[in-house]
Amino acid sequence: MGLFSSINVASTGLTAQRLRIDVISNNIANVSTSRTPDGGPYRRQRIIFAPRVNNPYWKGPFIPDYLDNGIGQGVRVASIEKDKSPLKLKYDPAHPDSISSGDKKGYVELPNVNLVEEMVDMISASRAYEANSTVINSSKSMFRSALAILQG
């Protein structure tokens, strides 16, 4: 662990939460998009996070894996996935994207985006971003105090 590892870990959190906020913003912006370039309605996106881990120097053949999780180096975005939950149906036969035949005739498929859920996720991501920012500021303050002690 280096001197700036706390700042490095928190900066990975800042980057991950910024991307999460971008994806949530994209979901909110497309809450009523009934047709995308792919042809169907917009599908909600979500981010999958994974830990950034380095193998520790003490890892050996005699240490069981469950005792050794590695050295944490923050978080990374593993993927951005489309939500497979069912789309919303709204009856609107005058809509240009309404279904023209079958049992769902006159219905329009709308995105599976729940605005309330997105706003809750946005607040959560904002708070996590703020927490990571606080970690960076606290680390900088500790470094300043340590330098002041060393300077006498």
From Swiss-Prot:
Q: Where in the cell is it found?
A: Bacterial flagellum basal body
Q: One GO term of the cellular component aspect?
A: bacterial-type flagellum basal body, rod
What GO biological process terms does the UniProt entry carry, in alphabetical order?
Answer: bacterial-type flagellum-dependent swarming motility
The main place the protein resides is other
Identify the InterPro entries for this entry. Flag_bb_rod_N (IPR001444), Flagellar_basal_body_rod_CS (IPR019776), Flg_bb/hook_C_dom (IPR010930), FlgC (IPR006299)
Keywords on record: Bacterial flagellum
Q: Write out the similarity annotation.
A: Belongs to the flagella basal body rod proteins family.
Q: What is annotated about its quaternary structure and interactions? A: The basal body constitutes a major portion of the flagellar organelle and consists of four rings (L,P,S, and M) mounted on a central rod. The rod consists of about 26 subunits of FlgG in the distal portion, and FlgB, FlgC and FlgF are thought to build up the proximal portion of the rod with about 6 subunits each.
What NCBIfam families does the record point to?
A: FlgC
Q: What is this protein called?
A: Flagellar basal-body rod protein FlgC
What organism is the protein native to? Answer: Borreliella burgdorferi (strain ATCC 35210 / DSM 4680 / CIP 102532 / B31)
- Taxonomic lineage of this organism? Bacteria, Pseudomonadati, Spirochaetota, Spirochaetia, Spirochaetales
The gene from which this protein is expressed is: flgC
